[in-house]
């Protein structure tokens, strides 16, 4: 169990029947609890009874974006749910050792909670992040500064932290392998692993230390890559999905980088600088691929930050040990710890360069990322060195070709057709967001939005960068309601949007591509509302996308009143044909106040798309769904299908791609 924030707890539970039998093939579940928990450490390894609806986490809604379901799989969690209440059902373990184990774990978790409560607010976030990987105490701006500087790894308990503490242990014990020293080492590794929730990087570091010590005891040579491979195999055998986690990938990639690159760097470089440079070389393209950003100061910033962390971690751990054991020593050490925390933050902030320490980049192709890393590791290997010395160029080229073929194969296995579609109805939650592209140009209509969540920064920007879009040529808004306009405004604050327009009226035509067969026609309204801030749904802009012979009607939040008024206007001009469309973006998220029967009869779509997310409004309305299905219209929804893509295939019709497959 770990605290997520001030108002919410997350509990990882293992499911059993009421008689204490573990459910067959039952995965772990992650439960969210929104009430206060007194003495939460008592829940560690306790049995609880609860009633909750458990479900599967949804896969990613948009292509090449964060996949929460995959993240949970990497942690060996398959189910999620929300707790309203629970009761402790404590049962004693069968053996004394298991009882002792459980009580010691609870003691550690208790100390961590109480330790956090006694820290000063200005240093709590950094200390809990660096020491235990608990970033919930840090504000988002501080975390972003660490990310931009390439120093965020100090906020996730990693091999760096375990290595620092292991190095301190070696100095204190003079690297002895006597029984008491080994017992002390085992206790330390278990304790720190428990406090850091056994993150993949912690598990990797702990197991590699165990192998190193075992090698000394058995008088066997320790090889870093062999140990790394063995640990990797053990973790994959335990949970094959662990490879989906970025923490796992970065941890093992960082060690591979040190193993391959550090030995080819100039010998004059200090070990700490050589390791930092090797890790940066190995992770730069991976970070661009995974996080769509490249730090310009990472190498320079890591030198002082890692140096200070080398002193900060032992001091923080010493402070934690004295907490609750010797209050006087704790009180004497705390001022030094606070001062070092402020110094570490000051040094890190100094490298942000006013927000210019990192640049956003579009996601490089997967095949290029794999080929770059595989080729670089091969070029730095002893095998390649021997082949070069023997002038066996054909074998070198053959190895590189094999790496390239493997990279291309991986690219093929992860291919997503929706990434290349002409029109994508982006999953922005409860809101509208439509991405159009043609001839290298990109147009965005609406952009979702929520007062509780930055859709522009956290949804739209990762979507565009992850799918190779570095700028938006034109952004249009049907109207200024939050769930259409706010996300677009947030995007424009930290992403290049060349031009924005809102309040378009009937008769306006927009050509955003050199292709003469692609244009956007505005059909409604005839006049703008007097007060744009109070504009009603019946007067929002309505667009008809003409795309190489196909037509897509985009209605924003147009309600029944607006639909019938627009219909009457075009009927009066004998131009109802202008309303006919192959695809209808259903108005107002499928609300019962939209999609009038007469309107649907005139538009006569074959495909309908409802942009809707989890909501309390009853969207989409069952009546609207019934009207559409009664007319033989194929219905696609963002809340069910995730992002929805349209590929116009000329005489072959329209291909619809979705991120998720709907349940049968």
Briefly describe each language-model feature range:
Residues 108, 204-207, 220, 484, ...:
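Short, cationic motifs built from Arg/Lys/His that form the positively charged side of catalytic pockets
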Residues 39-40, 44, 48-53, 64, ...:
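Non-globular, low-confidence helical/coil segments that flank catalytic cores
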Residues 1-153, 457-462, 471, 503, ...:
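Membrane-interface helix/helix-cap signal primarily in integral membrane proteins
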Residues 59-60, 161-164, 200, 250, ...:
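Short hydrophobic/aromatic residue motifs in ordered secondary structure
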Residues 2-4, 247, 428:
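Feature for secretory/organellar precursors and membrane-associated catalytic proteins
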Residues 81, 139-301, 315, 362-418, ...:
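Hydrophobic alpha-helical transmembrane segments in multi-pass membrane proteins
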Residues 74-206, 213, 424, 551-556, ...:
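Aromatic-rich juxtamembrane segments at the membrane interface
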Residues 96, 100-119, 126-127, 134, ...:
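Hydrophobic alpha-helical segments of integral membrane proteins
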